[in-house]
Amino acid sequence: MNYQPTPEDRFTFGLWTVGWQGRDPFGDATRQALDPAESVRRLSELGAYGVTFHDDDLIPFGSSDTERESHIKRFRQALDATGMKVPMATTNLFTHPVFKDGAFTANDRDVRRYALRKTIRNIDLAVELGASVYVAWGGREGAESGAAKDVRDALDRMKEAFDLLGEYVTEQGYDLKFAIEPKPNEPRGDILLPTVGHALAFIERLERPELYGVNPEVGHEQMAGLNFPHGIAQALWAGKLFHIDLNGQSGIKYDQDLRFGAGDLRAAFWLVDLLERAGYAGPRHFDFKPPRTEDFDGVWASAAGCMRNYLILKDRAAAFRADPQVQEALAAARLDELARPTAEDGLAALLADRSAYDTFDVDAAAARGMAFEHLDQLAMDHLLGAR
């Protein structure tokens, strides 16, 4: 099997991923800064489809207008030379100290207004570069103490911000949608909209909910102890999976941002199986950090590993679904019954059906095995390469 990625696989990387210098709360950078144009070229050589960026990844904070245009020009030239795309962009509303108490929900009203203007400016650039999705990660939107933030007011301000952004892109005629990225904590002690479920509920309160979806990240949901494929399934069910961030995470701890497949391998297998069966058409976007132990050779090896692992899992998942024994096991586990409506004949017929309650043999039903273990072992065999 050929696991060499091509642009048709639609693999994308954030500039901040391969460009991460290895700086963390306990140590300084272990790598030099990487030119965005160089990232574009190297990722293209590896078979990627495109790149994404925060405004400050591409244009250093505080750049003059002349410097800004110079950075954009060099980036465009790299895109044109390689054919790489920019399907998504986002705003850095977390690094500069001005955002120490958040951006859209900062208690300081002036900071909130600045955050909106900063975002709008980058939306214009994102659209110019061809982006169709704009991600919003509220990493500083939260609190460490109960009295510091009235969460109801903060949610009002967050709603106001997204409604204003929706109004702006509508007035401009932009073909752009927003994807909210949940995370439970880090860097704030507790972050607003911590999970996919919180974000989906919030979206329903917005003035233009059709413009908003979610951008779930593997590690973020797993930091909350949740099942990531289940969260993705609910986002797909709601028609709100506008983007996805793929990486690796090993349990409930800090945000590890491992390369995809390097954390919970079973969850990664079921995730790829779900995305491919659902016909998800968006980019497979990697939001990871090459470990600070690595030099630049290790950076590119890590990026290549993300794509290779996805393709291996895609191959294994397809083989699992095509296996005749798996088809038999799925039938034995009654998956076809789950897909059938419980009361397709309506409420009246359900209430009139004595076999549904009065004569239903609960003991016989309780004694029926579900054959889930056999089915799961077949999946393990395929995942581990034993079938």
UniProtKB/Swiss-Prot annotation:
Reactions mediated catalytically:
alpha-D-xylose = alpha-D-xylulofuranose
Catalytic class of the enzyme: isomerase
Q: Which SUPFAM superfamilies match?
A: Xylose isomerase-like (SSF51658)
The primary location reported for this protein is cytoplasm
Taken from the UniProt record, the cysteine pairs bridged by disulfide bonds within this chain are none
Q: What positions does the entry give for Mg(2+) 2 binding?
A: 217, 220, 255, 257
So which cofactors does this thing need? Mg(2+)
Quote the InterPro entries the UniProt record gives: Xyl_isomerase-like_sf (IPR036237), Xyl_isomerase-like_TIM-brl (IPR013022), XylA_actinobac (IPR013453), Xylose_isomerase (IPR001998)
Q: Does this UniProt record's set of keywords contain Heme?
A: no
Q: Which Gene3D superfamilies match?
A: Divalent-metal-dependent TIM barrel enzymes
Name used for this protein in its record: Xylose isomerase
